[in-house]
């Protein structure tokens, strides 16, 4: 008998989707083979999440056609998608913390989800699913008590319970340790072997090469390339995404002798308003001319550490030495004093804490520094000087468009981040605290930000880098400190670091 090629699991033709003046998808066509893992990559704003939201029924395309397993379909909403066997796991989990794992699966899927008889039947089905997929977890545990990796397994179980044959995953490893990522990939590989079709939205090109069969690259709302992963390379994918060659890999150069200690923290203890310990017995030193990376799953005390060292948070106990001065918990430094002593801070959330979104760029570019002599004297502010300085920052840090009058919210994420970096690095700091410097930032902007941090290191600045991206920590750091539940679980020179070793420390293990 002649071989019959199966119909694609998904075929999208000529998809157009516009939001006001923004063309999010322009004549996009996509074909996903059944029983494969298909990666979709592209910079922020490339249109990949919009395309998958059209497939899942969150948005309706302005025009175009969709086929699922060879049949033309009209997907009006998520219920239609689920009925067609399409499931989606979002980057930000959609779970109810106060319900158990079992109840979360049943919620919205079973009309009598509170009845014991219904729960017993669903439990049997879920136990069978866990056995066949390897997605093991405690069904009676409250979601609030589940680890991040378990929450993701629960989200996948939810979609499979509802009959998903096509599984869309949006940045699934963003909050996972390397070990959790490895387990997830084992599960996804098993699902692929069982015939499930998986669409993976990601910006981590190593993961595409490791897991996917086929990859589609999008840029500016269009598909620019579609190829088998066996024919692809990380460098080629990055170039296709950006439209030019980029370099964001490791580039440490020869190790240099540590310079003088510019910041020293001892025995830091932080409790929140509910008296829950967030940092405990934390010791830290930063030397001139080094980048120290703080690795760990988000929520393990990294944010509190940045706030503490920048003067935004006061400890219950501990000591800090900075700029020749010593600060005790009872008389901690404030942000203004920190800036006067040469410490600059790039917060993790640029929109909420680094910029005023309805301010013009020139006002955002001088926040915290408007008392400098360059910006006025005698209590009078010289707005023209501020505008001129902002224009110079924009030129130096390649902020686009170069318009100091443009509202801060109108810049892309990458250009907002460059504006914040321009403000903080423009003062030639001795110590820089930087949180999540490339979160939501395109590859081209990442390359620029990396070059600026490396240049700062070469100029003798001490940089403390907090990042949830392990590749970023490994690419930039001279020394890595790992945090787990508010404490340091290990400290390693970069030469001794590997993803596996750091991953064990991120889970609370000891240095091997």
PLM region spans:
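Glycine-rich phosphate-binding loops of nucleotide-dependent enzymes
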Residues: 2-512
């Amino acid at each position: 008998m002649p071989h019959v090629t199966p119909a694609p699991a998904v075929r999208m033709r000529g998809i157009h989707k516009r939001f006001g003046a923004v063309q999010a998808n322009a004549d996009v066509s996509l074909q996903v083979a059944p029983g494969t893992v298909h990666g979709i990559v592209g910079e922020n704003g490339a249109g990949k999440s919009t395309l998958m939201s059209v497939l899942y029924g969150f948005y309706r395309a302005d025009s175009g056609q969709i086929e699922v397993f060879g049949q033309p379909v009209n997907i009006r909403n998520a219920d239609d998608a689920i009925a067609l066997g399409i499931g989606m796991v979002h980057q930000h989990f959609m779970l109810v913390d106060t319900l158990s794992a079992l109840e979360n699966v049943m919620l919205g899927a079973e009309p009598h989800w509170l009845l014991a008889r219904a729960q017993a039947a669903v439990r049997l089905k879920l136990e069978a699913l866990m056995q066949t997929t390897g997605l093991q977890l405690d069904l009676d545990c409250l979601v609030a008590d589940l680890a991040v990796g378990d929450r993701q397994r629960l989200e996948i179980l939810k979609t499979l319970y509802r009959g998903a044959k096509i599984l869309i995953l949006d940045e699934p490893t963003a909050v996972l340790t390397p070990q959790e990522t490895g387990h997830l990939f084992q599960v996804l590989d098993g699902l692929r072997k069982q015939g499930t079709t998986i669409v993976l939205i990601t910006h981590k090109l190593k993961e595409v090469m490791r897991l996917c069969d086929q990859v589609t690259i999008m840029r500016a709302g269009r598909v620019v390339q579609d190829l088998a992963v066996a024919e692809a390379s990380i460098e080629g994918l990055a170039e296709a995404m950006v439209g030019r060659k980029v370099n964001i890999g490791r580039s440490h150069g020869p190790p240099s002798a540590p310079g003088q200690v510019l910041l020293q923290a001892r025995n830091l203890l932080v409790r929140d308003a509910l008296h829950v310990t967030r940092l405990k017995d934390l010791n830290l030193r930063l030397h001139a001319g080094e980048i120290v990376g703080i690795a760990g799953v988000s929520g393990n005390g990294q944010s509190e550490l940045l706030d503490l060292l920048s003067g935004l948070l006061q400890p219950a106990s501990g000591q800090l030495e900075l700029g020749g001065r010593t600060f005790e918990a009872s008389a901690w430094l404030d942000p203004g004093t920190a800036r006067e002593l040469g410490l600059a801070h790039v917060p993790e959330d640029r929109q909420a804490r680094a910029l005023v979104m309805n301010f013009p760029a020139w006002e955002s570019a001088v926040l915290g520094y408007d008392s400098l002599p360059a910006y006025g004297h005698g209590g009078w502010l010289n707005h023209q000087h501020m505008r001129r300085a902002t224009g110079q920052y924009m030129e130096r840090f390649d902020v686009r468009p170069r318009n100091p009058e443009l509202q801060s919210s109108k810049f892309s994420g990458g250009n907002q981040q460059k504006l914040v970096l321009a403000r903080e690095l423009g003062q030639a700091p001795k110590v820089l605290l930087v949180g999540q410097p490339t979160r939501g930032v395109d590859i081209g902007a990442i390359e620029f930000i990396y070059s600026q941090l490396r240049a700062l290191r070469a100029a003798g600045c001490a940089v403390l880098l907090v990042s949830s991206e392990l590749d970023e920590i490994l690419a930039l750091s001279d020394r890595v400190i790992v945090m787990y539940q508010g404490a340091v679980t290990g400290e390693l020179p970069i030469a001794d670091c590997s993803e596996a070793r750091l991953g064990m420390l991120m889970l609370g293990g000891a240095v091997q």
